[in-house]
């Protein structure tokens, strides 16, 4: 079944009709870290992305979550596409972060097992794909022109200090499996953190990847 078009084309439009604390909430943990983990479609919009983002951040990285609060609401009702996502707290956090990773959920469809890793930060993207595969998780790099590639310059993941970021699209079946197995969730998050740490070391040293 085709996904319905988003009800709102910006957070500004959403805020005019929806009530914070009833329909949605914004949760942010700003830390002295160059890394921001964001989940702009969290809560009941794309289930489990909030928990996955929290586990990746692990009290170390800055964390942002925009959460839909009503389980009866449909995906399109509170989903603002990443190119149009203009919630001010998210904008500010991302603009002040050197490394940005956005956590999203996608439908299983033709590839129910692979995390799709996109975004314009191709070096970090590739490190995350490799790290997930090493730990036994299926992952593929998404490239410009492919669906859910996160390759638009306006995508919120690409609006950080370096104007590049990573977008992680996790299929529903994988999200459900991670929620059902705390150790597997920790392992998944740890693989991503390890890739971020490796990338951060190279970035601070000025070496080429």
Predicted features along the sequence, with ranges:
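N-terminal catalytic or cofactor-binding beta/alpha core of small enzyme domains
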Residues: 1-209
């Amino acid at each position: 079944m085709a996904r319905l078009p988003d009800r709102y084309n910006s957070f500004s439009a959403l805020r005019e009709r929806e009530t914070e604390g009833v329909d949605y909430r914004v949760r942010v943990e700003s830390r002295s870290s160059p890394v921001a983990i964001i989940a702009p479609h969290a809560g009941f919009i794309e289930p489990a992305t909030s928990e996955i983002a929290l586990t990746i951040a692990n009290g170390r990285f800055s964390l942002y979550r925009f959460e839909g609060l009503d389980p009866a609401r449909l995906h399109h009702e509170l989903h603002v596409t990443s190119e149009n996502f203009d919630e001010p707290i998210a904008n500010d956090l991302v603009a002040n972060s050197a490394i940005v990773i956005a956590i999203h959920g996608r439908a299983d469809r033709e590839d129910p097992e692979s995390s799709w890793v996109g975004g314009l930060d191709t070096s970090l993207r590739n490190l995350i794909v490799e790290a997930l595969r090493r730990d036994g998780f299926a992952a593929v790099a998404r490239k410009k022109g492919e669906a859910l590639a996160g390759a638009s310059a306006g995508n919120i993941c690409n609006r950080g200090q370096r104007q590049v970021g990573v977008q992680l699209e996790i299929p529903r079946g994988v999200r459900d499996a991670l929620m059902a197995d705390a150790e597997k969730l920790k392992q998944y998050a740890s693989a991503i953190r390890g890739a971020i740490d490796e990338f951060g070391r190279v970035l601070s040293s000025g070496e080429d990847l």
